[in-house]
Amino acid sequence: MSLFELLEPTIAGMGYELVDIEQSAPGRLLRVFIDKKEGSITLDDCVAISNHLSQLLAVENIDYNRLEVSSPGLDRPLKKKADFVRYMGESARIRLRIALQGQRNFVGTLVEVNDDVLTLNADGKLLQIELRNLEKARLIPKL
């Protein structure tokens, strides 16, 4: 079982979404990014998750020196199909594994997701991008 699979149901059970996990060399830093459907992540949210995960990681005998829990930030990564659905109409920066029309990097508006294919409006052109071809996708913050 992966660490993501271990933590996701616990975090979901507390009313949050596990966005991402970053690990440095084994046994060092474990960084967990959380979000929630309504509102912003607060310091109290991070403390509650951190306290709960500390106990879970101890029980599961997961070795780490430092645990950090935070929000994913304004430029939130988009990883799952549900992320793209949730942020339809928002602007995103997309990097592909395999080039599309000779290009791997795109900036555009998320239009829709059907059958694991994302439609992105990039400079007025509607691009069809298979989700499995995404290397990286992040929201572009509204300032």
Curated annotation (Swiss-Prot):
**GO biological processes:** ribosomal small subunit assembly; translation
| One Pfam family recorded for the sequence | DUF150_C
Localization, UniProt: Cytoplasm
Q: Please state the protein's primary subcellular location.
A: cytoplasm
Q: Does the keyword Hydrolase apply?
A: no
Q: Which UniProt keywords apply?
A: Cytoplasm, Ribosome biogenesis
Q: Can you list the GO cellular component terms from the UniProt entry?
A: cytosol
Please give the SUPFAM superfamilies that the UniProt record associates with this protein: YhbC-like, C-terminal domain, YhbC-like, N-terminal domain
Per the similarity annotation, which family is this?
Answer: Belongs to the RimP family.
Q: Which PANTHER family match?
A: RIBOSOME MATURATION FACTOR RIMP
Q: What is this protein called?
A: Ribosome maturation factor RimP
Provenance organism: Nitrosomonas europaea (strain ATCC 19718 / CIP 103999 / KCTC 2705 / NBRC 14298)
Lineage of origin: Bacteria, Pseudomonadati, Pseudomonadota, Betaproteobacteria, Nitrosomonadales
Q: Which gene encodes it?
A: rimP
